[in-house]
Each structure stands twice: as structure tokens, then as C-alpha cells.
């Protein structure tokens, strides 16, 4: 599933292409379960004629800011992608949402596995989306002190805590493994047991792993592309994730894969304590 870097890059590459454009109509919606709120009929009606004024990201949601105070929130889930296509481009069978713009271009939401989701939110809906998610790890407010506060008193293992979107928003399996490797912390360590130095190292590890991925265009393991259709290259720079049986780049020990909170988890048994 695309995580914070991939979602940010998808949002940026989509937003810069369509900001200022007006959505004339929803031209295709053949998988109505994609729309979580409002009803599919209301979604189609309310989107028509809305102009795109800006874009953003919250957690793993792509946000398009529309006139009238509405926000179109799109979640790529496992296999979703958003691209801008010429006026005459035909959607394939996996393109379940098509938005026609006033200059004739089309926005395709393609999702072979049909896990992607769309929400059209008013101000209250947007506030609820914000409230459901925790701190943004690349924000100025996410300091070492703030991370220490979030971990204090929590006896859960550190990796599932990092994956909890209500605590820290946007981190998934890839960047949890990469951040913990950078911080030299075992994924099963209780969060409340981390020392002040380890919390600081984890804070640095989280931000460094995410920033590296942004620099490298995100991680493409199978489906991810940005809205220009470009693959990321960050998968070529993993230190722990998806490197089972390979040597640790830091100490040479063999990277192990185990299961933590029902998620495949990669770590170095020597470096990470």
C-alpha cells in the first residue's frame, strides 16, 4: 500500500496538473462501493461544476480542495493510481472513476483490486478525517518531545504503534521497518521502554526514511506510480524492508523476516536491540 511519501508524490503530481480546472462531470463510476460518502448519486451531483483550488495530503489520503468548501479525498489503498489523460483516452476495465475536466482532459482513478476509496467531504467531514488521524511525522509539530509524549506509558510493541494511524499518520510497513533499522530498535520493543536517546534516534529515523523516499520518487514494489505514470526508485535503497536473507548494510548480519502484528517485518538481529 502506498504510504506517506507515495501519497504525497501522487497528490503533488496530480494537483499541479489540474489545479484551476473545473470538474464538469463524473463520467464514469462503475464500482459504486468506491464511494464511502456521500451516496454515489450525491457524489456525482455534488462534484459536477466544482473547481479545483488546491491539493494536499492527510495521512494516506490525497486531498483535492474544491470551491464551496468541499474536499475530494482519495485513498489509493493497495493498487490504486491517479493519472491525467487526454480527452479521447479510453478507460480500461480497471478504471473505475473518471472525472471530465472543463478543458476536455480526464482524471482516471484506476484500481485493479478495487480497494481504493473516495469521499466528498464538507467542512465537518474534513474535520472528522483530521481527527481520525494522528501526528504528521514530517510536520514541524512532530518534535522529539512530541514523539516521547506519544510513546509514554504505551506498552505496545513499537512497530504496531508506528503503524497505528491514530497515533502517527502515514507510516506503513515499509517505513516502519526502515525507521526502526535506522534507529537500531527491535520491532518488538515496548514503546514505553525506549530511552530518551532511542526516542531521538527513532524520530530521526522516521523523518530520514520518509525524506529519502520522497527524494527517490517513492517505493514501487508492484503497482505504485505517481500521477505522471512514473515509478519510484526508493526500493533500490532499502536497508531492511524486503531484504530477508541479505546482509545488513551496517553490520553484515543476515536480515530476518518475522511477523509482528500480522505484518511481515524485516530487521537486523544484531543491530536492532
From Swiss-Prot:
The active site is at residues 2-3, 60, 263. It catalyses: Hydrolysis of DNA containing ring-opened 7-methylguanine residues, releasing 2,6-diamino-4-hydroxy-5-(N-methyl)formamidopyrimidine; 2'-deoxyribonucleotide-(2'-deoxyribose 5'-phosphate)-2'-deoxyribonucleotide-DNA = a 3'-end 2'-deoxyribonucleotide-(2,3-dehydro-2,3-deoxyribose 5'-phosphate)-DNA + a 5'-end 5'-phospho-2'-deoxyribonucleoside-DNA + H(+). The keyword Transcription regulation does not apply. Keywords: DNA damage, DNA repair, DNA-binding, Glycosidase, Hydrolase, Lyase, Metal-binding, Multifunctional enzyme, Zinc, Zinc-finger. Its EC number is 3.2.2.23, 4.2.99.18. One of its GO terms (molecular function) is 8-oxo-7,8-dihydroguanine DNA N-glycosylase activity. This is Formamidopyrimidine-DNA glycosylase. It comes from Roseiflexus sp. (strain RS-1).
Amino acid at each position: 500500500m502506498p504510504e506517506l511519501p507515495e501519497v504525497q508524490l501522487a497528490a503533488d503530481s496530480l494537483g499541479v496538473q489540474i489545479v484551476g480546472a473545473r470538474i464538469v462531470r463524473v463520467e464514469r463510476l462503475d464500482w459504486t462501493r468506491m464511494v464511502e460518502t456521500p451516496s454515489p448519486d450525491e457524489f456525482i451531483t455534488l462534484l459536477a461544476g466544482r473547481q479545483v483550488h488546491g491539493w494536499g495530503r492527510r495521512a494516506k489520503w490525497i486531498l483535492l480542495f474544491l470551491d464551496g468548501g468541499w474536499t475530494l479525498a482519495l485513498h489509493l489503498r493497495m493498487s490504486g493510481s491517479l493519472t491525467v489523460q487526454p480527452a479521447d483516452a479510453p478507460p480500461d476495465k480497471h478504471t473505475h472513476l473518471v472525472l471530465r475536466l472543463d478543458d476536455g482532459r480526464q482524471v482516471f482513478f484506476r484500481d485493479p483490486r478495487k480497494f481504493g476509496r473516495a469521499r466528498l467531504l464538507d467542512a465537518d467531514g474534513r474535520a472528522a478525517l483530521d481527527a481520525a488521524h494522528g501526528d504528521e511525522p514530517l510536520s514541524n509539530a512532530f518534535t522529539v518531545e512530541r514523539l516521547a509524549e506519544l510513546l509514554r506509558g504505551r506498552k505496545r510493541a513499537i512497530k504496531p504503534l508506528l503503524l497505528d494511524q491514530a497515533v502517527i499518520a502515514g507510516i506503513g510497513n515499509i517505513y516502519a521497518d526502515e525507521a526502526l533499522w535506522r534507529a537500531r530498535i527491535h520491532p518488538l520493543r515496548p514503546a514505553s521502554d525506549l530511552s530518551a536517546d532511542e526516542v531521538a534516534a527513532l524520530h530521526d529515523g522516521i523523518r530520514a526514511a520518509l525524506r529519502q523516499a520522497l527524494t527517490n520518487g517513492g517505493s514501487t514494489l508492484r503497482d505504485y506510480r505517481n500521477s505522471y505514470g512514473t515509478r519510484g526508485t526508493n526500493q533500490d535503497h532499502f536497508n531492511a524492508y524486503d531484504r530477508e536473507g541479505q546482509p545488513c548494510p551496517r553490520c553484515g548480519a543476515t536480515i530476518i523476516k518475522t511477523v509482528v502484528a500480522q505484518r511481515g517485518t524485516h530487521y537486523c538481529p544484531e543491530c536492532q536491540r
